[in-house]
Amino acid sequence: MAARKTYILKLYVAGNTPNSMRALNTLKEILENEFKGVYALKVIDVLKQPQLAEEDKILATPTLAKILPPPVRRIIGDLSDREKVLIGLDLLFDELSESELNGGKKNK
């Protein structure tokens, strides 16, 4: 069995607003269902750490960034659609490729 990739993600939010909390909860649900044990998520409140938002050129919240594996991908705004989040971060392709590799060949 091949080793699974580890995904490093950053979620930039602006305080504990309903929109920020909804984005965080939706994202955690997606990650726990699809990538349990193979991800690290760092939540950055841009109101408390504006220097991090500036360094990473974050212009709007919520913004989700996939840092590793490359390439870096970002989604800005609504994170409620699981498929759009996975496609936007290039994670759906990884998920499909892995399932094809694991189940694609049948022995007769």
Swiss-Prot record:
Keywords recorded for this protein, A-Z: Biological rhythms
Subunit and partners: May undergo a major conformational rearrangment; in the free state forms homooligomers. When bound to KaiC switches to a monomeric thioredoxin-fold (KaiB(fs)). The active oscillator complex is probably KaiC(6):KaiB(6).
InterPro entries, per the entry: Circ_KaiB, KaiB-like, KaiB_domain, Thioredoxin-like_sf
Role description: Component of the KaiBC clock protein complex, which constitutes the main circadian regulator in cyanobacteria; it may modify the ATPase activity of KaiC.
Gene3D superfamilies reported in the protein's UniProt record: Glutaredoxin
UniProt KW Transport keyword: no
SMART domains linked: KaiB
GO biological process: circadian rhythm
Organism domain of life: Bacteria
Species classification: Bacteria, Bacillati, Cyanobacteriota, Cyanophyceae, Synechococcales
Family stated for the protein in its record: Belongs to the KaiB family.
UniProt remark on domains: Has 2 forms, fold switches to a thioredoxin-like fold (KaiB(fs)) when bound to KaiC.
A family per Pfam: KaiB
Other remarks on this protein: The kiaA gene has been eliminated from Prochlorococcus during genome streamlining. It has been suggested that the central oscillator in Prochlorococcus does not have to be as robust as in other cyanobacteria because the former live in specific niches of the Earth's oceans; they divide exactly once a day and at the same time. Thus gene loss and changes in kaiB function compared to other cyanobacteria, can occur.
Record-given protein name: Circadian clock oscillator protein KaiB
